[in-house]
């Protein structure tokens, strides 16, 4: 069993912590929880830092609980949001809860050990909780002044905040109180933007029971340039393979900058300090090998998806971005071709469009603009810059006749620059 707080400190995973928590953790095995609002049918990489808090908490011998916010998700957390969230239907919330629970099982141990993880849903204790009872049992213990002092509320006052969202901190505070009473939960964890909600729960427990509870938050992960972490050009990077393919997930981590990778490997892997220090030293000696990025991508792709998905994603990356030749493409079996390129964006043209195209500009235009290119001028510039190839053969003249052999008798593999690949399917 290792020291939970010391482990988080060297990993840079502590933003705020209440006094006394470290001593309490050394006294006994305690139970802690993190809440996840089911606002989408999948968690995304922005949630991973808090999921890793629960993982390290369990590895340190403590008991983790993940609470899916079936009740609080009907409102949406206003913490540091600029506008009020759109309400989801009950059916959407139930579907999202089910999906999220499956994903959490990839990280936490739900075996029968002493500190087995638990999954709970706060709709179970809120569904029969009437408004008058809520005012008596919760509202009377927390003053308006206390609630107004929260930074997350202050930021919304000028533009207006609804009573629904203003009351959110009371709901989350009651979650903590309920779990304290029924499960012996003494610790709530979350992202740095959750500090106000966490301390409301601590205050409610103190006022109703006179007992002490604790909170810990992890820093919100940002890139080295200060921008939000967890998004690509296409939007959020999801943990669900139908929303973000294993290949795209793998590529996201592989494309991290060296500066980001040095921080992220501490947050998102379970490697020891010695192992990480050794990898960083090797990476500094040969940064072009992207040792850190490959390690992060491997560990997370296997954990979130599977080892098979990782192997396929790696093989696809090597074929697309490595030193593969046109001959390597022709040698692929149809089965391997489908597996390797299943994540590549695909556009469709007819055989007639292919044969009647007089030059490469016509061929690309026949696919329709908006996916590969936005205009013929953009295609022409790419060719002039030497950044366009088809089936691993560089296109040098925008007016050359597209006398191209189809892969698997129906595909053309288009590469634009180093990172963008597309399939043209001919039927």
UniProtKB/Swiss-Prot annotation:
Residues 358-426 form the S4 RNA-binding domain. A motif ('KMSKS' region) lies at residues 228-232. SUPFAM superfamilies: Alpha-L RNA-binding motif, Nucleotidylyl transferase. It is an enzyme of class 6 (ligase). One of its GO terms (molecular function) is RNA binding. Its main location: cytoplasm. L-tyrosine binds at residues 33, 168, 172. Its EC number is 6.1.1.1. GO terms for cellular component: cytosol. Gene3D superfamilies: HUPs, RNA-binding S4 domain, Tyrosyl-Transfer RNA Synthetase. GO terms for biological process: tyrosyl-tRNA aminoacylation. Belongs to the class-I aminoacyl-tRNA synthetase family. TyrS type 1 subfamily. This is Tyrosine--tRNA ligase. It comes from Amoebophilus asiaticus (strain 5a2). The gene is tyrS.
């Amino acid at each position: 069993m290792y020291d939970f707080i010391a482990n988080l400190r060297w990993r840079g995973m502590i933003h705020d912590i209440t006094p006394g928590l470290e001593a309490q953790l050394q006294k006994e095995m305690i139970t802690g929880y993190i809440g996840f609002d089911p606002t989408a049918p999948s968690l995304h990489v922005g949630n991973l830092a808090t999921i890793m808090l629960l993982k390290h908490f369990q590895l340190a011998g403590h008991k983790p609980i993940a609470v899916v916010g079936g009740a609080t998700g009907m409102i949406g957390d206003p913490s540091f949001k600029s506008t009020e969230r759109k309400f989801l239907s009950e059916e959407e919330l139930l579907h999202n809860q089910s999906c999220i629970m499956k994903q959490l099982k990839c990280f936490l141990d739900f075996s029968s050990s002493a500190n087995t993880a638990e999954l709970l849903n706060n709709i179970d204790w809120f569904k029969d909780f009437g408004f008058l009872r809520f005012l008596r049992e919760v509202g009377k213990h927390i003053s308006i002044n206390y609630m107004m002092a929260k930074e997350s509320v202050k930021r919304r006052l000028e533009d207006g905040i609804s009573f629904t969202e203003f009351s959110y901190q009371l709901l989350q505070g009651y979650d903590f109180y309920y779990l304290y009473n029924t499960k012996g939960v003494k610790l709530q964890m979350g992202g740095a933007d959750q500090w106000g909600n966490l301390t409301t729960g601590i205050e409610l427990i103190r006022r109703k029971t006179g007992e002490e509870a604790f909170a810990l938050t992890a820093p919100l992960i940002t890139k080295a340039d200060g921008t939000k972490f967890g998004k690509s050009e296409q939007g959020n990077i999801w943990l669900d393979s139908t929303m973000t393919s294993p290949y795209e997930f793998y590529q996201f981590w592989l494309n991290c900058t060296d500066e980001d990778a040095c921080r992220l490997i501490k947050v998102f892997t379970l490697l020891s300090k010695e192992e990480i220090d050794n990898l960083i030293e090797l990476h500094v000696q040969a940064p072009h090998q992207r040792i850190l990025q490959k390690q992060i991508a491997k560990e997370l792709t296997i954990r979130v998806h599977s080892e098979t998905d990782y192997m396929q994603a790696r093989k696809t990356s090597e074929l697309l971005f490595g030193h593969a030749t046109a001959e390597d493409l022709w040698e692929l079996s149809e089965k391997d071709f489908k597996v390797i390129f299943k994540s590549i964006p695909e556009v469709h043209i007819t055989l007639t469009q292919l044969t009647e195209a007089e030059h490469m500009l016509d061929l690309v235009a026949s696919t329709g603009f908006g996916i590969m290119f936005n205009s013929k001028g953009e295609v022409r510039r790419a060719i002039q810059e030497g950044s366009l190839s088809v089936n691993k053969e560089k296109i040098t003249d925008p007016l050359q006749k597209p006398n191209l052999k189809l892969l698997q008798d129906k595909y053309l593999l288009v590469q634009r620059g180093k990172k963008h690949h597309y399939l043209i399917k001919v039927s």
